[in-house]
Amino acid sequence: YDYATFLNEAYTNDGKDPKFTPEAVEAFRTHSNPIIYPDTDWMELLFKSSAPQTQGNVNISGGTERVRYFISMGMLDQKGFFKNHDTRYDANFNFNRYNYRANLDIDFTKTTLVAINMGGRVEKRNFPRSGDDINQLFRRIYWATPFSGPGIVDGKWIKGNSQYLPVGLSDGLGNIYGRGYGSKTTNVVNLDLALTQKLDFVTKGLQFKIKVAYNSGYDHTKERATSIESYQPWYRKDVTWMEHPAGSDPNEVVYIQDGEAGLISYAESFGKSRDWYAEASFDWKRDFGLHHLSALALYNQSKTYYPDSDYPGIPRGYVGLVGRVTYDYDNKYLIEGNVGYNGSENFAPGNRYGFFPAVSGGWVLTQEEFLKDNPVVNFLKIRASYGIVGNDRYHPYGTGFMDRFLYLPNSYFIGSGYQFGTGTSWSPGAYEKSFGNSGLSWEKSAKQNYGIDFSLFNQKLSGSIDYFYEKRTDILAKASTDPIIHAMSLPVLNLGIVSNKGVELNLKWNHKINSFRYWTNLNVSYAKNKIVYQDEVPSEYTYTLKTGHPVGQPFGLKVRGFYYEGMEDVADHSYVLKEGDVVYEDLNHDGKIDDNDKTAIGYPSYPLLNAGLTLGFEYKGFDFSMLWVGATKTSRVLEETFRKPLGETYDRSLMSHQFTDRWTPETAATAKLPRATIDGVKNNYRDSELWVKDASYLRLKNIEIGYNFRLPFMPKIGMEKMRVFMTGYNLLTFDKLKISDPESMSSGVPQYPVMRVINFGLNVSF
């Protein structure tokens, strides 16, 4: 009813005839004809209110003085929360995993230790064969209109009939029901072997270690496609191409079949992954009275096969050297120096290796005589560090993998065709994809940290305070100011500077009163980055530039309000404004609204301020803990699904707030959204602060209640511990966004919803 009212109002506001007839509007209001004029809640029809999850884990450890072992096995079974309306198969988002790990440590001699570790997992994911990624699947569900069909009636898929409904006949079942299903099985194996040899006979405290690791993955995807018949409801009197039984009611609703149920087809695909890692190191630790020294020299190398890139057949390799020296005097004065020397395939031989040093120091004041044995201050340490790290990876925006061999031109790119000469036919061919840059080198990040660690009141209160500053330079990026028209992509350059600074606070209170122990942990962090330099097209309007703003800062138009007759100083909007249309600010005062009026609006999608609070207690076998997390100074730019009522094609869904918050003559003083219109969509739904929403939230992330049993029979059977518990995840959320999960940085688009999980469990140890 709201949808029909809104759409009719939009057409009326634009001086056009309403789309829905009075009969249809009244039927929606009264629900008097739910087959011809349905009002379907697709979320209720498609989703269960809950789905089961089962998890188990078994750990076994033991051994002798020289041989020790640890074995772990686990399983996880998660059922999807889609309702299965097609009983021919299960098309839900189910997930099943079995994981295992076995560790074996052997002391071959008093100075020789061999560690053999093996682990892995087997996973199976079941999914509906919709042909879309998960976001697009949920986007289509959001798009479904309530009158596009009644859904499943008497086991039949009933779709809306355009004879009676003028728009919006893509229903919520269309992209998931009767289309088949798929399953992906993944098998991952992780192996590593480490040998540690003490070399005290060379010099005391010296040891040599060598480690090799091998990881392998294989996946097999099976897809089974099919189709299913659907039906359209008709009044019998409108089915003029068929004969009807004598005396039948002309207003009776009959179903006319559309399509046939198809056979299930089969397709499969395979994937694989493989990588190895090796390192060799000398490690030395030695004490000379109150002087404590250590040193490390390490070589590492890795290779990844079948990487996600333009060259999956060429393995990706890394090689590096690491050095570290530490010194402390009487656990009072501490200093550490590190160096890294790493090589990457992405740079030319002259720039392939990067040198990355770091140094840190600390002073434990409570080791000094003036603070030692202080009744209030149990521990106090100040520290500082400075270091440089490197990055060699460039991820083009919108791609799922990183570019490789950035110093070389991409040799070719298969094109869809080219028209040679005067002919009109397309000829296949290849062309150079992008330039290389032989002068490219490592992106660098210089990091500083200054902190204080403390413990007070007999260690009841402890915590740390940190200030950090980071400056990224030589950022890997492509130029955006080159005015020349190129036939291929520009090369990656060392282009860009970004700074980041912030503070972190961690506080812990832990106290015991007789049998009652309680604790609380608080952590708060604030960080803000800024683009110091970015290759931008120069503009006389500095407020349009990204330089000086955080990375990912949204830009758009500032909103003055909604238009009303007699409104003064209104710039040209390239559209004749009507009452209830959005009016934007003309920031450059040139009398027109365009991209030169766009400025920074809202915050980036990542929060600037994060916080977490843990509370808990233990008392005579009972234990309780809960974790609250929150964030603020973060925004989401709503995409078309959440922004535009009726969508781009004017026949998609209408969200409830888009109806209740719209401008009307009666709500002009309180309206939050523009009037219902079709003609004014281009103006009203431009990128502006109207569609940047506060994504601050407070969430009860985790809560756990448990009880440890101490029963007489337990020692008799070798049972050391038995605990029952209940845990809950994502139980409560307080936020202003409402339409999606505020904790997800992509919550401005439709996505698989966050799950509220409640577990009951038993933990037994022997």
Language model regions located:
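Glycine-rich, aromatic-lined ligand/substrate-binding cores of catalytic
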Residues: K204, P604-V637
